[in-house]
Amino acid sequence: MKIRILRDTETVRYAAEELKKYLYMMDSDIEAEICCEGDGEITLGLLSDLKLDNSDVKDAMVDDVVDVKIDSLSGYIAGSNERSILFGVYKYLKSAGCRWVRPGDEGEYIPKKDMSRHSFAYRKKADYPFRGQAIEGAVSFEHVRDTILWLPKVDMNLFQIEQIVPYNYMSRWYLHTANTKLPHDDIPYEDYVRYAAELELIVKKCGLQLHGLGHAALNEAFGIRYKAPYMTYDIPEDAKDALALVQGERKLFNGHPMQTHLCMSQKWVRDRVVNWLIDYMKEKPYIDFMHFWLADAINNQCECEDCKKKTPSDWYVEMLNEIDARLTEEKIDSKIIFIMYVDTLWPPIIEKLNNPSRFIMTTACGSGKGYSDKRREGGIPKWERNNYSIVGGLDMALTFIDGWKPIFDGPRFVYEYMFYTGHYADPGYMTFARKVAKDMKELRVTGFDGIMSDQTQRCYFPTGLPVSVFGEFLFDTSLDTEEYIDKYMQDSFGEGWREAKEYLEKISASFDPEAMKQNTDVTAQDTGCVDVNSKKAGIIGNEALGDIIATVPDTVDKFAPVIEKYITLSDKCHRESWRILKYHGIYCKGISDVYYALSRGDQKGALDIFWKFADKLSEIEMEIHPYFDLCLFHQRTKQVIAGK
């Protein structure tokens, strides 16, 4: 048979190659040929190429519409853009029983099937246009590569590679910073540069939205390249006058480039930043969305007399307009993502965006608390320079967004952290997965157009269920949660899936994920502004919860024979799922010991147990590293032990 592509581009050809590969894996009688001319049994193209309805496509850069009609290996797969054609390929394959339960080859379940008898008709516009991830945690090139290739298989359409070179995230893996057994030897910096470039190419091959920059790019124009928070940085002589004046000094705030603002009232400073950004974008015009953010941290705005003439948001918008004008001059169509965060939560008083269509808004408003359209009582508080003290949250973010609407009322998405360390609160992932499904269904009431998930690319321990739910429920909020969970577990574990599901339900229930949450979310940790009245008792001193957690080792031991029964299944995906579950039992027993000590109020004892457990995890990390981020586990667990 022939697969005809109407556009011979990298992404469309990749979609055709994926279709060819998996058709053959399902049905070895199908040896497809990819062609550009003549007739083909299956045709791949844009909606417009095939003269199909595209009336619901407002912006092909962000609107994903999939249209598939194939009857007995004859028909078409079409999309509003090239990545939507790839989505369509996977939709067709999934309709025939294929499933990608986690990244990597061992996460793909491809059944045998006579495809000549299979038919599928489907048309759907994604419910949210922004669905994806940003690099985070401790990750290797392979971890991120496999994630990017997996994203379109679960309906995600974007990936952000934060920083010029994501050294902070990738070096944690290559240095094995949290592993007490492996050597802490770095690789050459040039390798990180090469990895970043290769990852960008993979994002583009899949046709995904490529998001670039973010925090830490602000000082690049002055020769200050941020790598990691523990490093020391020299300030070039010509950069000193460009740094924000804080408490009478112009220096790196907390010694940290990512936390350092500039003196934005000085035009030469703004010009230098703008020129650097334009040069960067001329080198990489393929970046679809450039995130231009200011510094992280609080109480670090410039206090010089000229900067005090306008608010940080006014200076920010002035610079955004300057960047937009230069991009227009250079005929670069990339969108600009601006962030409503800390001081720029407050809308500008003087400045307006000259070209709102260039921009997308994002904001970080905490995670794990669900979504509603409630606003903060009392409205927008008064802004004071370097006296930031507000407690964030969704209600506060929506209140500020209302204030921004006269200036900008365009597309916006949430910068979320649910998979940063939140998944560690539920070792079974079952309660967590249902919470993610509920949140994705409720997001619409906020007016947000999707989610960028700042997360580790290694959160599939014990399953990829929550992340799969995240992607596929953002694409289609009408999915039934319980039906989805059952089908996922069946595809992941094969024979014995009901036993696996029942076991993981017990694990989730034993830990009570709601009580295991940290008292402060990531945004609160960054700003230090926490509502003490909202803190929960959690696990420390919670003897009733500790008594339940104490049953976990017995639950694990009783289930061990079931794992041994299914761990040799013939299908590689099913076999790997059961193997992961075996190592996950070691994890459940160890973390239950830590939490039991905390339930008795013994924080010192819990820390001692944690370090012994961390040694054990270090010994087995190479068996589970694609699925479990040991570095963020260290960070999260030590914070819980400390009562944070």
Where are these regions (language model features)?
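Gly/Pro-rich turn-and-neighbor structural signature
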Residues: 197, 258-261, 265-405, 416
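Feature activates predominantly on carbohydrate-active enzymes
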Residues: 2, 8, 12-18, 22, ...
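Short, well-ordered secondary-structure micro-motifs within conserved domains or adaptor modules
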Residues: 30-59
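Short glycine-biased active-site loop of nucleotidyltransferases that positions the nucleotide triphosphate
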Residues: 226, 348-355, 429, 461-463
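Structured mid-domain segments that build the active-site/substrate or prosthetic-cofactor binding neighborhood
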Residues: 269, 279, 381-498, 502
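Conserved, mostly hydrophobic/aromatic
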Residues: 23, 81, 151, 273, ...
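Catalytic domains of carbohydrate-active enzymes that cleave complex glycans
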Residues: 447, 472-644
